[in-house]
Amino acid sequence: MTNSRNKGAQFERDIAKKLYQLLGVNFARDLDQYRAADHGDLIPDDPDFPFVIECKRYAAGTGCMPGWWAQVWRAAERTKLLPCVIYKYDRRDIRCVIPLGAVFECSHDYTIEMDLETFAYICREIMADD
């Protein structure tokens, strides 16, 4: 468990760094995620950032697991932000999943998956509208 927790923590730090490079927004790891339920993994320093982010790093798998989506959705309801899962499997690219409703008006049951750069583009567009 320690290795998997370290792997997850390193992935969170990597995503925070990449998002800073793409958006100019600083992110800190939310250490309350280990003490209380329904927290995202990264906290932005920009109050206009529209997403609560859950980061997942695993050796193998395909796509965003339903449990991950349910977890970030609970955090999104608590924080009144849009949910986002950023995940990576070994030897695969980083993927981001957000509700399709973040881009088009529709039910939260539909999601859209994209790379990190596209996610950053959508974040910039949403933040510019505010």
Predicted feature locations:
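Catalytic phosphate/metal-binding cores of nucleic-acid and nucleotide-processing enzymes, i.e., regions
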Residues: M1-D130
